[in-house]
């Protein structure tokens, strides 16, 4: 029996990257999964992957910047599966730039997506979990939400907010049987990274050059992050709440971090 057998999970941004890998892993571990995403083409592809592997899932279109759509995603999960045991607030954007390089529109969009999106989906799910007497929320933070990052003023700010929102929710709802933790990934390869590769570089050469700046000599994979999310979502972390689990290849272990 899987580690999430009998559980229902709602995952925002479950159409690609860490969200997609987590949705597939959760389903493989026995959870029924609702994938909430803006890109329904990719979400449907994730759904097909899960169903082909023998899992159970569904999809719903959701822009986490809109509170009413987050409520709709929770309601749809309840209608389809009957409960909400796990919420993985994964949807987010990663713009680069210092304060001087960041436009007001980008600043507002980052906060709306990364911070308000986490707030909205949690706010919609918490009453359900309180009524159930149990629930787990996992927020996708970042190692740059713990130490800050070069040329990532808006992103680091948003993830720092997610880190403290995680701790605050954990304190507020611990006595109601609800645990709230955050995963803090370091640099993790996702397909959109390919646009940053120089034309003359092979993918292997580029990945090798990126990894040289990390203590472990490589960047992470989405599957590695998904396994850490699974730990936080499962009963294996039953005595953990309000914690930030950093999975970054040792990048934040010392006094400096990788620069871009």
Question: Can you describe what each PLM-predicted range is?
Answer:
Residues 8, 15-16, 39:
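Conserved glycine-rich cofactor-binding loop
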Residues 142:
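Residue(s) in the substrate-gating loop at a strand-loop-helix junction
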Residues 127, 171-175, 238:
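Alpha-helical segment proximal to the catalytic Tyr-Lys
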Residues 122, 158, 166:
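Active-site helix of classical SDR
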Residues 100, 147-153, 175-176, 217, ...:
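Active-site loop immediately N-terminal to the catalytic Tyr-X3-Lys motif
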Residues 98-99, 106-111, 210:
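Substrate-binding pocket helix/loop in short-chain dehydrogenase/reductase
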Residues 230, 241-260:
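Short C-terminal tail/terminal secondary-structure segment
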């Amino acid at each position: 029996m899987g580690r999430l057998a009998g559980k229902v999970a709602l995952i925002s941004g479950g159409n690609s990257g860490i969200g997609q890998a987590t949705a597939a892993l959760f389903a493989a571990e026995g959870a029924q999964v609702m994938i909430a995403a803006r890109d329904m083409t990719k979400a449907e592809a994730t759904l097909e992957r899960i169903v082909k592997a023998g899992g159970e899932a569904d999809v719903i279109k959701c822009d986490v910047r809109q509170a009413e759509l987050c409520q709709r995603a929770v309601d749809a999960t309840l209608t389809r599966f009957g409960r909400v045991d796990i919420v993985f607030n994964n949807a987010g954007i990663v713009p680069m730039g210092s304060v001087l390089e960041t436009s007001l529109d980008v600043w507002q969009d980052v906060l709306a997506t990364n911070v308000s999106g986490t707030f909205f989906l949690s706010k919609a799910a918490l009453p359900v979990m309180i009524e159930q007497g149990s629930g787990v929320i996992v927020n996708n933070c970042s190692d740059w939400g713990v130490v800050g990052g070069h040329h990532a003023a808006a992103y680091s700010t948003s993830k720092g907010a997610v880190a403290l929102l995680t701790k605050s929710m954990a304190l507020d709802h611990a006595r109601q049987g609800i645990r709230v933790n955050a995963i803090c990934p370091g640099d993790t390869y996702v397909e959109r990274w390919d646009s940053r590769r120089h034309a003359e570089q092979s993918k292997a050469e580029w990945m090798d050059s990126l990894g040289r700046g990390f203590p472990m000599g490589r960047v992470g994979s989405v599957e590695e992050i998904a396994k850490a999310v699974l730990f936080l979502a499962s009963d294996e972390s039953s005595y953990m709440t309000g914690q930030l689990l950093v999975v970054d290849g040792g990048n934040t272990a010392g006094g400096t971090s990788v620069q871009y």
